Swiss-Prot record:
The cysteine framework is V (CC-CC). It comes from Conus purpurascens. Pfam families: Chi-conotoxin (PF16981). Residues 20-50 form a propeptide. In vivo, low levels of the peptide injected into male specimens of the Siamese fighting fish causes an immediate aggressive display in this fish in response to their reflection when placed in a mirrored aquarium; High levels of the peptide suppressed this behavior. No effect is observed when injected into mice. Its main location: secreted. It is found in: Secreted. This is Conotoxin p5a.
Length: 63
């Protein structure tokens, strides 16, 4: 029972530990929002080329 308070204190300290990035940022790193914008733009171009409507994906024919 003596270990329980120590265990609880350690659990409380874990979330307050400072965050450390596993990999340092490089000049090639891209923000996630920019990645999503690029993916969205690519999908919109694909839909326009295929004559698809984005709300009804089943109207798209691949191939």
């Amino acid at each position: 029972m003596r270990c329980l308070p120590v265990f609880v204190i350690l659990l409380l300290l874990i979330p307050s530990a400072p965050c450390v990035d596993a990999h340092p940022k490089t000049k090639d790193d891209m923000p996630l929002a920019s990645f999503h914008d690029n993916a969205k733009g690519t999908l919109q171009r694909f839909w326009k080329k295929r004559g698809c409507c984005p709300k009804q994906m089943r109207c798209c024919t691949l191939g």
